């Protein structure tokens, strides 16, 4: 059975997921497609493994931006798709193949029927890490075409097709990676008094970290520390010289993130003293909260509800992390959830978004952009 042009594009992209700042095939695919649209009104820039496209308006007074993240995840796919990933151990398990496809669809509509204002499309690498939004925002390439308004979307498996969900103000949390390396003294399991066990030290640290949430964060605020991975030791009868904890920190407020990190550092210092070991903390990538511009979001929700076929839901904030938050620090705009009705959630090896959502998103976003970017 034949599929639509943009469903096919999504399937093409789904086959070639690549991790952050290694999206060379994805970048080339985007450039090849844009090459079919080029005319005197379209300009293209390459930034690292990303692409920035400008469509000149007929009588521009402002620049409207659309951001699509393009990277995949280090997950082995289990969808059973005929168009499953051909890159072993990598998958588009967060919907960035849909985000990119919708961006290309919106770009196609913009080239076909130009509006008054300029449009800029940001095909951004490395959202899943180490973070592409902030360096792209600071790049010379984008500074020349910096939008006055910017929007982005994220697929939502829990919402039905034909639905969007968003809210004014805080939408997504502040997030930070967390890595703690502990180094003590290894030894024979029969002589624990001559060694310094970093498995035991790591176990104490994991337990103590949870007290930060229950005793150091305002209960009316929200924060989560998750340790998702612990490594240490070599065999069962050798006391481990080293251990490593890997996790994430998520807070709704910026103030809580600072407080949580301060307490983590104090607890780790206590572990060093208690177990006579050395500890190193690395926070890795940190993403700023996604805070939607109130007036623009309210206007967008009203427009979509009254003038399109989409259903609009006012959702609650989520502990999800998104580096789009950095763009919203600098540029007024908003992000919204796009319903794709999947049994399996984000970052799951069996995530299967309903492809019907692609065309619906292109259509209603094109309606919104034309309305927002055309003088009445």
Swiss-Prot record:
GO biological process entries: diaminopimelate biosynthetic process; lysine biosynthetic process via diaminopimelate
UniProt KW keywords: Amino-acid biosynthesis, Diaminopimelate biosynthesis, Hydrolase, Lysine biosynthesis
Reactions listed under catalytic activity: N-acetyl-(2S,6S)-2,6-diaminopimelate + H2O = (2S,6S)-2,6-diaminopimelate + acetate
Domain of life: Bacteria
Enzyme Commission numbers on file: 3.5.1.47
Pathway entry: Amino-acid biosynthesis; L-lysine biosynthesis via DAP pathway; LL-2,6-diaminopimelate from (S)-tetrahydrodipicolinate (acetylase route): step 3/3
Enzyme active site: 69, 128
UniProt cross-references to Pfam families, sorted A to Z: M20_dimer, Peptidase_M20
A molecular-function term among this protein's GO annotations: N-acetyldiaminopimelate deacetylase activity
Annotated family: Belongs to the peptidase M20A family. N-acetyldiaminopimelate deacetylase subfamily.
Chain's role: Catalyzes the conversion of N-acetyl-diaminopimelate to diaminopimelate and acetate.
Protein name: N-acetyldiaminopimelate deacetylase
Organism (species): Bacillus thuringiensis subsp. konkukian (strain 97-27)
């Amino acid at each position: 059975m034949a599929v639509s042009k943009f469903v096919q594009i999504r399937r093409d992209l789904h086959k070639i997921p690549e991790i952050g700042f290694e999206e060379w095939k994805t970048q080339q695919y985007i450039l090849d497609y844009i090459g079919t649209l080029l005319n005197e009104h379209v300009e293209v820039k390459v930034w690292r493994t990303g692409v920035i496209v400008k469509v000149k308006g007929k009588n521009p007074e402002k620049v409207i931006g659309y951001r699509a993240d393009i990277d995949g995840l280090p997950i082995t796919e289990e969808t059973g798709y005929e168009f499953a990933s051909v890159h072993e151990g990598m998958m588009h398990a967060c919907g960035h193949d849909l985000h990119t496809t919708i961006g290309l669809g919106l770009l196609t509509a913009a080239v076909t029927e130009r509006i008054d204002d300029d449009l800029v499309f940001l095909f951004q690498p490395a959202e899943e890490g180490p973070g592409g939004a902030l360096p792209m925002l600071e790049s010379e390439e984008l500074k020349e075409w910096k939008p006055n308004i910017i929007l982005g979307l994220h697929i939502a498996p829990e919402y039905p097709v034909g639905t969007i969900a968003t809210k004014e103000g805080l939408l997504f949390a502040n997030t930070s990676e967390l890595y703690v390396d502990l180094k003590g003294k290894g030894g024979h399991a029969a002589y624990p008094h001559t060694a310094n066990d970093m498995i035991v030290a790591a176990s104490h640290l994991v337990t103590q970290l949870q007290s930060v949430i229950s005793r150091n964060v305002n209960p009316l605020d929200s924060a989560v520390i998750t340790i998702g991975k612990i490594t240490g030791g070599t065999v069962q009868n050798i006391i481990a010289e080293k251990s490593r904890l890997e996790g994430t920190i998520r807070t709704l407020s910026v103030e809580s993130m600072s407080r949580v990190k301060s307490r983590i550092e104090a607890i780790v210092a206590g572990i060093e003293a208690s177990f006579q070991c050395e500890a190193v903390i690395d926070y890795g990538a940190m993403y700023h909260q996604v805070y939607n511009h109130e007036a623009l979001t309210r206007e967008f929700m009203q427009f979509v509800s009254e003038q399109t076929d989409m259903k609009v839901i006012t959702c609650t904030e989520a502990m999800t992390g998104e580096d789009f938050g950095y763009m919203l620090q600098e540029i007024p705009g908003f992000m919204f959830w796009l319903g794709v009705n999947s049994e399996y959630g984000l970052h799951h090896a069996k995530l299967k978004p309903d492809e019907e959502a692609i065309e619906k998103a292109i259509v209603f976003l094109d309606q919104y952009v034309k309305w927002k970017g055309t003088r009445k």
